[in-house]
Amino acid sequence: MARNDIRPIIKLKSTAGTGYTYVTRKNKRNNPDRITLKKFDPIARKHVEFREER
């Protein structure tokens, strides 16, 4: 029970508009705001910003 409360599963969606997503977990205590990470988008074939989707 407690595992999913502290570190929920989130989707990171590409801002390039390709619709590609990464699935990961985040720590709500350390990062209460939405996460943005630069990761590789294989459809766009470049590194782009991925934002947390709620």
Curated annotation (Swiss-Prot):
An individual GO BP term: translation
Organism of provenance: Corynebacterium kroppenstedtii (strain DSM 44385 / JCM 11950 / CIP 105744 / CCUG 35717)
Single GO cellular component term: cytosolic large ribosomal subunit
Family statement: Belongs to the bacterial ribosomal protein bL33 family.
Keywords: Ribonucleoprotein, Ribosomal protein
Protein name from the UniProt record: Large ribosomal subunit protein bL33
Domain of life: Bacteria
HAMAP family linked: Ribosomal_bL33 (MF_00294)
